[in-house]
């Protein structure tokens, strides 16, 4: 125990200064518990309020798709350039070194494949395991308007309830069924429902018309999915448009790891998200970094 000799009375109480507790300013998250805010503060940069996530969880239903055949070779070099890693618990345990020291968003839904109906998912991760793996959030699909809409919403509710008990945020990922139209009306509905169910982060797709309305109508942070592989200049333009219209970051996979120069592309995306660079300037950075 501390030495009891020569204990001095405190004097520097600054009685003229009220106690300060800096508020947590992430959109819609000011009333959350300390532990959940702490995890969210690791996901979102404290200075910019934004994030660049690297998604490589595709194997949970696609298997070893292009670019993810050997995650230890193709994806591991990208870890240091990402703010957050998004993956499954299987890949985290088998491939990601603990010393990587990056916040992790764990895929928490699954039980389907590309050979069956994609929207037929179940919760595929216990909250105990998410805590055991020191993750900063869990993520699950929500399929509004699909055959299994009800089950996917129940999955989100289950994860939110379990997460609230341990201070673990839930990210709802707005999946799109085979016959659904990707437009502002649909994503406004899907993102709002997910937020109303309690999800603390929403991952959705960027749309050319009305994206700012999607963001405005969602009371928690939105990060955009990268979606299918685009030419680098187009992917950076999508990032810039989304950030300019209010997105809180990106969660990109194929547009990073399927690029001819993934590290250069990651740096260019970081420039858009955290440094407000235009798509043109970010593309110039990409070209210079790939040399």
Curated annotation (Swiss-Prot):
Quaternary structure annotation from Swiss-Prot or TrEMBL: Homodecamer.
CDD domains: DhnA (cd00958)
Gene3D superfamilies according to UniProt: Aldolase class I
Name of the gene: lsrF
Domain of life: Bacteria
Function: Involved in the degradation of phospho-AI-2, thereby terminating induction of the lsr operon and closing the AI-2 signaling cycle. Catalyzes the transfer of an acetyl moiety from 3-hydroxy-5-phosphonooxypentane-2,4-dione to CoA to form glycerone phosphate and acetyl-CoA.
Keyword check for Cytoplasm: yes
Record's GO cellular component terms: cytoplasm
Gene Ontology terms, MF aspect: acyltransferase activity, transferring groups other than amino-acyl groups; fructose-bisphosphate aldolase activity
Cellular localization per UniProt: Cytoplasm
This protein's name: 3-hydroxy-5-phosphonooxypentane-2,4-dione thiolase
PANTHER family membership: 3-HYDROXY-5-PHOSPHONOOXYPENTANE-2,4-DIONE THIOLASE (PTHR47916:SF1), FRUCTOSE-BISPHOSPHATE ALDOLASE CLASS 1 (PTHR47916)
């Amino acid at each position: 125990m501390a030495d009891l000799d020569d204990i001095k009375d405190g004097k520097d109480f600054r009685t003229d200064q009220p106690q300060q507790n800096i508020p947590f300013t992430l959109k819609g998250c000011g009333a959350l518990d300390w532990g959940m805010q702490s995890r969210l503060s690791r996901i979102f940069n404290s200075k910019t309020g934004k994030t660049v996530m690297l998604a490589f969880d595709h194997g949970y239903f696609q298997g070893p798709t292009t670019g993810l055949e050997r995650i230890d070779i193709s994806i591991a070099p990208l870890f240091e350039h990402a703010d957050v890693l998004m993956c499954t618990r299987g890949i985290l345990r088998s491939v990601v070194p603990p010393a990587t020291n990056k916040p992790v968003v764990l895929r928490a839904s699954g039980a389907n494949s590309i050979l069956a109906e994609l929207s037929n998912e179940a919760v595929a991760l216990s909250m105990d395991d998410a805590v055991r793996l020191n993750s900063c959030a869990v993520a699950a699909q929500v399929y509004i308007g699909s055959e299994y809409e009800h089950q996917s919403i129940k999955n989100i509710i289950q994860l939110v309830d379990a997460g609230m008990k341990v201070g673990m945020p839930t990210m709802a990922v707005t999946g799109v069924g085979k016959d659904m139209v990707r437009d502002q009306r649909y994503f406004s509905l899907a993102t709002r429902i997910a937020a109303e169910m309690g999800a603390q982060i929403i991952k959705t797709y960027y749309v050319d018309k009305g994206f700012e309305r999607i963001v405005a109508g969602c009371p928690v942070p939105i990060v955009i999915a990268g979606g299918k592989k685009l030419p680098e200049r187009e992917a950076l333009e999508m990032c810039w448009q989304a950030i300019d219209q209010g997105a809180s970051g990106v969660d990109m996979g194929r547009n990073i790891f399927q690029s001819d120069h993934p590290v250069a592309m990651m740096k260019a995306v970081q420039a858009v998200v955290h440094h407000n660079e235009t798509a043109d300037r970010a593309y110039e950075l990409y070209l210079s970094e790939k040399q």
